[in-house]
From Swiss-Prot:
Protein's UniProt name: C1GALT1-specific chaperone 1
Subcellular location field: Membrane
Assembly with partners or alone: Associates with core 1 beta-3-galactosyltransferase (C1GALT1), probably not with the soluble active form.
Domain of life: Eukaryota
Lumenal side: 27-316
Keyword Iron: no
Sequence similarity: Belongs to the glycosyltransferase 31 family. Beta3-Gal-T subfamily.
Gene Ontology BP, a term: platelet morphogenesis
Organism of provenance: Mus musculus
Gene from which this protein is expressed: C1galt1c1
Residue intervals annotated with topology Cytoplasmic: 1-6
């Protein structure tokens, strides 16, 4: 039999959960009704799609397809910050770091807040105000994330940036479907436009979460985008495997060795993966070597379309 004190604590916990749910529903409600939307499973183009593109179109795509990268950092992330700066962000058409405070070691844009949601919304507003006429797609990541930007561009190849895309690794929390920031978040310029129009409307996109329960920044973003008619969509390859990953390659391989010991490499993850998360600085450099430097003699990949790294990139 539970003691009176434990019964009291149980009641407090249940009451808190109830209040949290009410707060969450209040955020997601649009007008006087709820919008019901099952997220789509968007796939990368196949080789046949690419083969149908003319040589002139391929050249134009390789030059005009532009991705702006946003990395949210804090001073405690300085070693990860250095690794990200020296590795995959060099393949973004432009990458900028948004920090919680001024950091002398690396150049960054000071958001002057430790709150991750405030940092995220300020970074999105800055990116839209500064670069809305220069970039088609906006990719946001943590400093623990490694991204293969060429694979991101390939995945987005047949997607229309004038449509409201909100892509990545989707997660469902109650009635809310959102893209996990751990795997990286991709917004089209149209989604950025819609989000920007709501950032100054606190009733639909508040700077803070509920008074009782604060939700994570990626969930808060989904709430704001839902008001704008933009919904989370899961990104997959032609085999249905996720291309935005919230875990590291090492963890995927460990799981595959347990669950699919005869198909560790094939069962691990997509060979067109865009992101992995939870990496150390050392693992960032290992990934960079494996993705861009290591070659198996005799194995040649004749890709029909090549996305060239931006001018000034030291990586090939």
């Amino acid at each position: 039999m539970l003691s009176e004190s434990s019964s009291f604590l149980k009641g407090v916990m249940l009451g808190s959960i109830f209040c949290a749910l009410i707060t969450m529903l209040g955020h997601i409600r649009i007008g006087n009704r709820m919008h019901h939307h099952e997220h789509h499973h968007l796939q990368a183009p196949n080789k046949d799609d690419i083969s149908k593109i003319s040589e002139a179109e391929r050249m134009e795509l390789s030059k005009s397809f532009r991705v702006y990268c946003i990395v949210l950092v804090k001073p405690k992330d300085v070693s990860l910050w250095a690794a990200v700066k020296e590795t995959w962000t060099k393949h973004c058409d432009k990458a900028e770091f948004f920090s919680s405070e001024n950091v002398k070691v690396f150049e960054s844009i000071n958001m002057d807040t430790n709150d991750m949601w405030l940092m995220m919304r300020k970074a999105y507003k800055y990116a839209y105000d500064q670069y809305r006429d220069q970039y088609n797609w906006f990719f946001l990541a943590r400093p623990t994330t490694f991204a293969v930007i060429e694979n991101l561009k390939y995945f987005l190849l047949k997607k229309d940036q004038s449509q409201p895309f909100y892509l990545g690794h989707t997660v469902k929390s109650g009635d809310l479907e959102y893209v996990s920031v751990d795997g990286g978040i991709v917004l089209s310029i149209e989604s950025m436009k819609r989000l920007n129009s709501l950032l100054s409307v606190p009733e639909k996109c508040p700077e803070q979460g509920g008074m009782i329960w604060k939700i994570s920044e990626d969930k808060q973003l989904a709430v704001c985008l839902k008001y704008a008619g933009v919904f989370a969509e899961n990104a997959e390859d032609a085999d249905g495997k996720d291309v935005f990953n919230t875990k590291s390659v090492g963890l995927f391989i460990k799981e595959a060795m347990t669950n699919q010991p005869n198909q560790v490499v094939e069962g691990c993850c997509s060979d067109m993966a865009v992101t992995f998360n939870g990496l150390t600085p050392n693992q960032m450099h290992v990934m960079m070597y494996g993705v861009y430097r290591l070659r198996a003699f005799g194995h040649v990949f004749n890709d029909a379309l090549v996305f060239l790294p931006p001018n000034g990139s030291e990586n090939d």
